[in-house]
C-alpha cells in the first residue's frame, strides 16, 4: 500500500508529514527529490541544457536566472521542463522502496497514479495566504499567482481519499490517528516497519469519496 500526501501552497502538508514521524513514517519529498535530481542527474542536466541553452548550469549549479527567463518566454516552457523532471522523480520514488510520498502537485504531475490512497491537507484560503506571506516574505498578489498554478483546493478534496484540516484549530494528531493506513502500523515489528518504509520508532479525519 502506497500513500500520497498533497495540499496546496500554505496548507501545511509538510507540517503534517513531520507529525507522521511520530509513527516512524518516512515520507518521500517529491519537491526535494526534483531539486536533487536536477542537480545530480547527468541525463536531466543534458536534457535541460539542450532545452534551455548552454548557460543552464554554471559551474555545475543550476542557473535559476536562465531558467526563469526561459519560463517567461512561453506558458508551454514549464510543461517542457516538467516533461523532463517528473518522469525522473517518478522513477526515483519507485526505486526508493518508500511507501509514503509528499507532492504539492499530486494530480497535476500524474504521480498520484503511483499511490493507492491520497491524503489532502486543507486550510482556509486566508490562512494559507497569510502563512505563505509570512514564511516567504512576499506579497498577497504573488501568493495568489502561485495558487493559480495549482488545482483548486476543492477539486483536490473531491479526488482525495482522506482530508486533514490544518486550520490552526483542529487537532492534527487526532486526525492523523484516525487514518486506517496509519493506525495499522502501530503494532508492526521493527523489521516489518523497515520493509514498509518506516523506521523502528514508530478524532476527526474526514474520509473523501474517491472519484
Question: Over which residues does each language-model region extend?
Answer:
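ATP-binding Walker
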Residues: 11
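P-loop (Walker A) phosphate-binding loop of NTP-binding proteins
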Residues: 8, 20
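Hydrophobic anchor at the beta1->P-loop junction of P-loop NTPases
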Residues: 3-5
Amino acid at each position: 500500500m502506497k500513500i500520497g500526501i498533497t495540499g496546496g501552497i500554505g496548507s501545511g502538508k509538510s507540517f503534517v508529514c513531520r507529525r507522521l514521524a511520530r509513527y516512524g513514517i518516512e515520507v518521500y519529498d517529491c519537491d526535494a527529490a526534483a531539486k536533487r535530481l536536477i542537480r545530480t542527474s547527468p541525463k536531466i542536466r543534458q536534457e535541460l541544457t539542450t532545452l534551455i541553452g548552454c548557460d543552464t548550469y554554471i559551474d555545475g549549479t543550476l542557473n535559476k536566472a536562465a531558467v526563469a527567463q526561459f519560463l517567461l518566454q512561453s506558458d508551454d516552457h514549464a510543461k517542457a521542463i516538467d516533461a523532463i523532471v517528473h518522469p525522473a522523480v517518478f522513477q526515483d520514488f519507485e526505486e526508493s522502496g518508500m511507501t509514503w510520498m509528499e507532492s504539492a502537485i499530486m494530480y497535476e504531475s500524474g504521480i498520484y497514479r503511483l499511490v493507492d490512497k491520497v491524503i489532502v491537507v486543507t486550510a482556509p484560503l486566508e490562512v494559507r495566504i497569510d502563512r505563505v506571506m509570512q514564511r516567504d516574505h512576499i506579497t498577497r498578489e504573488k501568493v495568489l499567482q502561485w495558487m493559480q498554478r495549482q488545482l483548486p483546493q476543492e477539486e483536490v478534496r473531491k479526488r482525495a481519499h482522506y482530508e486533514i484540516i490544518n486550520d490552526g484549530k483542529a487537532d492534527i494528531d487526532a486526525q492523523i490517528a484516525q487514518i486506517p493506513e496509519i493506525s495499522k502500523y502501530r503494532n508492526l515489528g521493527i523489521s516489518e516497519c523497515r520493509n514498509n518504509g518506516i523506521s523502528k520508532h514508530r478524532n476527526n479525519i474526514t474520509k473523501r469519496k474517491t472519484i
